[in-house]
């Protein structure tokens, strides 16, 4: 959290944010992600060209300039319109309309959950998965958008999951990656 007033409540804070550490406000710590051996098998047994994993939810409180949720939705719609057989979407709540990052968006989703609509807003949606690696091992590329952009050093498991599976990530997020 970049809210300095919250940091002052504690004796010490650990953060991934280099700027906070540079100003003596925290200690930079990068949490390790177990990478394992990795897989290099070529692509002959990978039938799916592109996949995207993510939940259909938007971040409230983040300026739209930083929030990549709407860009994720644009990318999904582009593939559905231009290369539908080459793209698969996995995650939660994509059977609902695109989530707005407002209270109104939460209200719309609550109605959609209660009233079964007869439309499929994201035809590429294949459902949720328990094991992301199984899907990545059958895919050549994965769309890897962080939830927000522009925060140096902020990365999540998304990009590591792709690398470990020998999958090529199409990345958008931290500018220093």
Where would I find each of the regions flagged by the language model?
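Nucleotide-sugar donor-binding catalytic core of glycosyltransferases
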Residues: 1-177
